């Protein structure tokens, strides 16, 4: 089996992981952890979400985190924006990269953002135009690609329509998210190969380990030529629509897999694991990842 020779991981724990934690993490602690992640060799780190602090108190210090971190020559910092105001905040804070998110499933769109898929698409077009005008690289994340309430309840035709619609708007990357962990290795390959027929924009996969198939799905994606993934330290994260669900596939688990396959990442896994252990101690509980306690 031929795999990519190199894989790029984006660490999303400081955003997608931290936002689910009710125990507020002090700004200086977040900054110290992120700085250690930078030193571990992670090429991309999603460090904040530009949302209302009442809705997500953990992200109330987004600008402060960015200001205290400054720049890191070897690492791209990005933030998640859910509306035009969020894009403006990301640009004003000095980020060079922003992640945007739209629904592919009508029920998920109304549950999560209070808007239809078409409304989300129109808003995304405005956000992309603003972000590119402000000089930021844009990644568009499409949610629940493999299903929302049950596997397959998001039409693949809609995913393909969105991939085509946004193929010539200047995106840096196009991310397919298994937001509720509905994918399996066969469906991963079916969707990835279909999307590749309609867009040349680089693909990123954002996989959750909700049902224990995260690593198997990574292997399936590698077999389909995907070489960029979102991962989260220690497996931090979750899904607001599935109580008790685990989060993103764990960074340490993915790095261990890639190392064992001879695929280069440039990441020092023991350094990431050290941060995860400190996060675990701070939160007072074990994390869902496997390797963070072993390396």
Task: Give the location of each predicted region.
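Catalytic cores and adjacent flexible loops of soluble metabolic enzymes
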Residues: 1-295
């Amino acid at each position: 089996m031929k795999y990519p020779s190199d894989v790029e991981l984006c660490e999303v724990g400081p955003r997608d992981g931290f936002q689910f934690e009710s125990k507020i993490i002090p700004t200086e602690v977040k900054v110290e952890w992120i700085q250690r992640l930078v030193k571990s060799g992670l090429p991309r780190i999603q460090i904040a979400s530009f949302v209302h602090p009442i809705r997500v108190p953990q992200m109330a210090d987004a600008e402060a985190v960015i200001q205290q971190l400054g720049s890191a020559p070897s690492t791209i910092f990005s933030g998640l924006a859910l509306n035009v105001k969020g894009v403006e905040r990301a640009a004003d804070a000095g980020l060079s990269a922003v992640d945007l998110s739209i629904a592919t499933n009508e029920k998920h769109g109304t549950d999560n953002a209070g808007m239809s898929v078409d409304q989300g698409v129109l808003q995304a077009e405005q956000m992309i135009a603003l972000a590119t005008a402000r000089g930021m690289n844009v990644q568009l994340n499409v949610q629940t690609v493999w299903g929302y309430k049950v596997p397959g309840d998001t039409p693949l035709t809609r995913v393909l329509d969105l991939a085509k619609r946004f193929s010539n708007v200047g995106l840096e990357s196009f991310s397919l998210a298994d937001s509720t962990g509905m994918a399996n290795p066969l469906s991963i390959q079916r969707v990835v190969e279909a999307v590749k027929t309609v867009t040349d924009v680089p693909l990123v996969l954002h996989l959750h380990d909700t049902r224990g198939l995260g690593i198997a799905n990574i292997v399936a994606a590698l077999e389909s030529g995907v070489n960029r993934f979102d991962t989260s330290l220690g497996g931090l994260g979750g899904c607001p629509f599935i109580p008790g669900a685990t989060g993103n596939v764990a960074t340490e688990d993915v790095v261990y897999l890639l190392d064992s396959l001879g695929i280069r990442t440039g990441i020092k896994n023991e350094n990431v694991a050290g941060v995860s252990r400190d996060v675990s101690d701070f939160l007072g509980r074990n994390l869902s990842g496997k390797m963070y306690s072993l390396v």
